[in-house]
Amino acid sequence: MFRLFISTTARFCQARGLAPALSFAIDCTRAAPWALRWTSFIDRFCQDRFGTAAPLNLIRAGLSRPGGIGRGRRISRLRAHYDVIGAYFAATAATRMVFERAVPMAVVAGEGGCVYQLEVLTPEAHMRDEGELMLALSHAGGTVAALPFRFGYCGGNRLALRLGRMHVAAEAELVETDLYGLPVRSVLMDGVYALARTLGMTEISTELDDNNAFWSDCGATYIPGGRFSLPLEAQFWHSEAGRTALGEAWVPQQMARAEIMSQANAAVGSWLRYDEAAHGRARRPVSVAAVK
């Protein structure tokens, strides 16, 4: 443990300078034993899964306390999140998720010819208290909408998806017009449903926020603790009311949405880690941290 602390501090000093290294050392001292527990876990995880040391920013993430939660709960959440990535995702997708590289999910062209990408990214700094990854809809000009999330467990080894708050840019209405009226929030949720469906999630939940009306449209129900539980399949788009509300825009919009969903489902399926001994089924977690 002490040797790992020394070597990690040296890595900070070499890569970022003396001040960040001292800051890391001080935070580790203040947060012990949580800091050593987290550093040991994530370093072992990266060595076993990728054959390399954990990235410094990821080590640092375990020492923060976003949202005011305790360090123990923060580390439990992180361990569950990376446990799912390590157990379920193939090397290419897992490497991109851990080492902050984009994981493409779907590409769709708007009516005006603009190309939009749905992908999994590392959250921007101001979203790090809401999730360890984020679904993002973007084009050449930047991100239009983003949804932070993290993987977790509920009731033992059942998989769960914990969503953060929807972040939507001011230009969203223009993008929705170009996408035949398809709401950008719904595009992000198609990514959520692709993850939930392919991974066999048993729960999707989110905190109460300023998107409560949208969560209600998705069929969410309130659960104790200030959270919404979402259905595992889209509700609005399967209803006759949804079709009537859209009118003539229904057909081109649904064609665009069907293309996004098809690509997203195929993409997530290609990310999974399969075990031949399990006859093609995705691997189950090696270790389970049951946290909410």
Task: Indicate residue ranges for each PLM-predicted region.
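Terminal substrate-recognition subdomain of acyl/acetyltransferases
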Residues: 1-159, 166-175, 194-292
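Conserved acetyl-CoA-binding loop-helix of GNAT-fold acetyltransferases
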Residues: 176-194
